[in-house]
């Protein structure tokens, strides 16, 4: 029989939310207790705004910051080296919007593997809502988003 200390334990801190709004609540307010609990004592996060196509990335980041004032949030789009920003992030937040645009941007910027590495190997907390949760699966083939980039 295998000893527990010989096994590889695989634990990821992932919070997937179906939506940013529930029951006419303000943006992220229904999920806020779960988000803060998931982050525990973490007070900084990198926000991936690439699913947002109807607002600027700066505006989207500001919207998330306003909804979560307890956390200092920096948009990934502001970093000179987004790969390193993901690897160094205390937590990763990925917003909703267009799943196909989000995935396209992550592929173009070569961020999929670094996000996986951060979450799997560094145990970095990940929180995604809507499109940000859709990309957690093995494929986005089952999303009901329009396939428009």
List the predicted regions and their residue ranges.
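Short, basic, glycine/proline-bearing loop/turn elements
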Residues: 96-102
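Short hydrophobic targeting helices and cationic amphipathic motifs
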Residues: 4-6, 11
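Class I SAM-dependent methyltransferase SAM-binding "motif I" and its flanking Rossmann-like core
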Residues: 103-105, 112-121, 125-149
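N-terminal beta1-alpha1 cap of cysteine-dependent amidohydrolase-like domains
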Residues: 12-95
């Amino acid at each position: 029989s295998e000893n527990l200390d010989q096994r590889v334990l695989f634990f990821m801190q992932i919070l997937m939310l179906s939506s940013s709004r529930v029951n006419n609540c303000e943006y992220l307010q229904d999920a806020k207790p779960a988000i803060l609990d998931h982050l525990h004592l973490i007070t900084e996060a990198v926000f991936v705004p690439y699913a947002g196509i109807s607002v600027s990335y700066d505006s989207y980041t500001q919207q998330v910051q306003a909804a979560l004032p307890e956390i200092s949030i920096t948009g990934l789009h502001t970093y000179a080296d987004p790969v390193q920003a993901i690897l160094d992030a205390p937590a990763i937040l990925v917003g909703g919007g267009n799943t196909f645009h989000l995935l396209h941007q992550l592929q173009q910027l070569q961020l999929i593997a670094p996000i996986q590495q951060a979450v799997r190997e560094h145990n970095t907390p990940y929180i995604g809502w809507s499109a940000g949760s859709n990309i957690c699966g093995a494929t986005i083939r089952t999303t009901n988003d329009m396939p428009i980039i």
